[in-house]
Amino acid sequence: MLIALVLTSGALLLAPVLQNASSGGLSANDAVSLINREKAVVVDVCEPSEFAAGHIVGSKNIPLDDLPAKLAAAAKNKGLPLILVCQSGARSARAMAAAKTLGYEKVHSLGGGLAAWKSAGLPLEKV
């Protein structure tokens, strides 16, 4: 009985990690590591008004609909990690498919979007 409880607890704790990894969602802390250690490029796929209200320091704004046409100019080195961001993580998850189609291999979506970034106490800047 105790072994079953331990296995069940372990599976429940591991499930969100596996789900995040398979969906491409990236925690805010992991995003910071990629930015600092691997010079990841951060692209915010929100609309310009949302971007102006607050965005990750150093991020570039390319609305989701413009991504296929403008991503190559903003993220020239396809070998660097690319972190896509939006308010909640929904648009950035959709943007991942477009980025992969354009040849970007190290593409991530910030899990939970800017809401998760703010919850982690990480800084934002406004235009």
PLM-predicted stretches and their roles:
Residues M1-A40, P48-P81, A90-V127:
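Rhodanese-like catalytic fold shared by cysteine-dependent sulfurtransferases
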Residues V43:
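Conserved beta/loop motifs at nucleotide-recognition and modification sites
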Residues C86:
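Short cysteine clusters
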